[in-house]
């Protein structure tokens, strides 16, 4: 596959869970911006009913077609919204000093990344 060059030099953290319809809208915008570094954080399943959505979300974020450094933290257990917000940002900011933070229902315009 011929990879496109990154366009944005600010890392992006995407927090997601089991909502592929919402995540696909967010990820489409991120793909247009093509950040050079991407952090992917997913909370774990609460029960087996969450698994199809979790798998569908992982499939969406696996479709990276540009050059970027990708780090993934996919939790085995469910921490919930507030703890996941904290854990994901603590993880990302332990590696970088600035980062755009998006949740799976934050659909940015491409100009937001500039």
Stretches found by the model and what they are:
Residues 12-14, 40, 101:
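Structural beta-sheet core signal
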Residues 14, 64-67, 94, 110-111:
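Acidic/histidine-enriched, beta-strand-rich ligand/metal-binding domains
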């Amino acid at each position: 596959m011929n990879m496109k060059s990154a366009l944005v030099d600010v890392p992006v953290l995407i927090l997601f869970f089991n909502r592929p319809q919402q995540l696909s809208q967010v990820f489409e915008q991120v793909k247009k911006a093509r950040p050079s570094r991407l952090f992917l954080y997913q909370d774990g399943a609460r029960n087996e009913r969450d698994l199809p959505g979790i798998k569908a979300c992982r499939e969406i974020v696996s479709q990276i077609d540009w050059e970027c450094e990708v780090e993934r933290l996919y939790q085995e257990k469910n921490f919930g919204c507030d703890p996941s917000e904290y854990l994901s940002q603590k993880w990302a900011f332990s590696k970088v000093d600035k980062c755009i933070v998006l949740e799976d229902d934050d659909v940015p315009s491409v100009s937001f990344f500039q």
